[in-house]
Amino acid sequence: MKSVRYLIGLFAFIACYYLLPISTRLLWQPDETRYAEISREMLASGDWIVPHLLGLRYFEKPIAGYWINSIGQWLFGANNFGVRAGVIFATLLTTALVTWFTLRLWRDKRLALLATVIYLSLFIVYAIGTYAVLDPFIAFWLVAGMCSFWLAMQAQTWKGKSAGFLLLGITCGMGVMTKGFLALAVPVLSVLPWVATQKRWKDLFIYGWLAVISCVLTVLPWGLAIAQREPDFWHYFFWVEHIQRFALDDAQHRAPFWYYVPVIIAGSLPWLGLLPGALYTGWKNRKHSATVYLLSWTIMPLLFFSVAKGKLPTYILSCFASLAMLMAHYALLAAKNNPLALRINGWINIAFGVTGIIATFVVSPWGPMNTPVWQTFESYKVFCAWSIFSLWAFFGWYTLTNVEKTWPFAALCPLGLALLVGFSIPDRVMEGKHPQFFVEMTQESLQPSRYILTDSVGVAAGLAWSLQRDDIIMYRQTGELKYGLNYPDAKGRFVSGDEFANWLNQHRQEGIITLVLSVDRDEDINSLAIPPADAIDRQERLVLIQYRPK
């Protein structure tokens, strides 16, 4: 009976965090709008081989992540939940692997349940796992690969080992088709310390070739298909998206070596108090094969991405699967022997909640700031933000009431965040970062437009997805569409600032022309170097400028 209650509680937990509130949050640009539009165009065109954005070739990533996103929109429709359904599904599948692997290592159902809840409630897992990017997909394939490798190395028969390595190759192949060749590097780096300490080189060399073969066979059908359709895809994807992105001096998202230290700290909330003890206990028990495996799984990718020049928080998402297992194991030991770390965790959550309450007041209309984040008419959003941090502090306090038994309730600290964050976003943020909000405010003006031009790829993708059209024209800036715009058949999809006046004269009689520009809050629209417009509608950071036929 207790198991049934736990199962019902887990489903309720998942519903409150990962299902019910998702539709209340508008899509963020540039990431969510980009992936939403790529998948919408895939469904509309029926082209499941070559990814396109705004009707242009888009070679930033391979295809598998777009497939899953497209299936989400096909099943649930072109709405906020449909766009995020794929990443939520991937996050829940990863959670299932965490549950299974914990059971496999320790044969303890309670420990497996705790690892599950810890993983689902980690701030970084929740933030990325409900955000429509490709990282939850690659995290799933990496976690599946680590589970497959362990399964292979623990098998006692050649059939079991062969099956495990074949499965490893499939997961690596799907990882390559999701985000590229890092899906090969990360698992190899993660298992090498364990293989070395356990002296399992023989099995690796005997059966490893099976993983290579299954990986190649997994990638080969699509790899050949896109090479035939677009011969320069692999050249661009390998050199630009891998070498330049991570290794060269002009790598994207450059950051210092220590970049991931604050990411790990913030990402570990509301379980930050368990982080030092989990890592230390894991190191102290490094003679235990499973502990070494989890430590290597956590630390090696972290070191790899720290050395790389290009860094983003999303890159280390897969590390938190193993970290959640280490945390759950350590938490049970602490609850039994010395609950000091659990008390510290409770106080950290209280401090975080109280700090958030104070910070919310400071940036509210009633605080000391001359330019508050929220305006007076947005008072309900301020109260939503206060509620988020109040619930965080409350559950932090509750875990201290009988810490040996109540410490798992720290998983409820982010409950307010999950339920209310969509209602607390300030209008000034929504107007710049949520194109849906802009479209809603300017729907009547946008719909009849013959041409729509914009200077932001993220805004362009948001307009295209909301209006169900892929013919948005880039104005002045090409951004990440630069490569796709270089193709001969992309002529006319970009208009420079110097060419705009002539272009306007040539196309004005064809219908309404709408220009959507991103501007600074204090920027004077009249100073823009554009021809006089027939209508101007400013929505904080975005401005709609229209030209009608004469």
UniProtKB/Swiss-Prot annotation:
It catalyses: 4-amino-4-deoxy-alpha-L-arabinopyranosyl di-trans,octa-cis-undecaprenyl phosphate + lipid IVA = lipid IIA + di-trans,octa-cis-undecaprenyl phosphate. It is a multi-pass membrane protein. It holds the Pfam family PMT. Its EC number is 2.4.2.43. It is found in: Cell inner membrane. The chain crosses the membrane at residues 7-27, 81-101, 111-133, 137-154, 165-185, 204-224, 255-275, 288-308, 315-335, 346-366, 382-402, 406-426. Signal peptide: none annotated. It is an enzyme of class 2 (transferase). Its main location: membrane. Keywords: Cell inner membrane, Cell membrane, Glycosyltransferase, Lipid A biosynthesis, Lipid biosynthesis, Lipid metabolism, Lipopolysaccharide biosynthesis, Membrane, Transferase, Transmembrane, Transmembrane helix. The keyword Signal does not apply. InterPro entries: ArnT_tfrase, Glyco_trans_39/83, LipidA_mod_glycosyltrf_83. Pathway: Lipopolysaccharide metabolism; 4-amino-4-deoxy-beta-L-arabinose-lipid A biosynthesis. One of its GO terms (biological process) is response to iron(III) ion. GO terms for molecular function: 4-amino-4-deoxy-L-arabinose transferase activity; mannosyltransferase activity. It comes from the Bacteria. NCBIfam families: PRK13279.1. Catalyzes the transfer of the L-Ara4N moiety of the glycolipid undecaprenyl phosphate-alpha-L-Ara4N to lipid A. The modified arabinose is attached to lipid A and is required for resistance to polymyxin and cationic antimicrobial peptides. Belongs to the glycosyltransferase 83 family. This is Undecaprenyl phosphate-alpha-4-amino-4-deoxy-L-arabinose arabinosyl transferase. It comes from Escherichia coli O139:H28 (strain E24377A / ETEC).
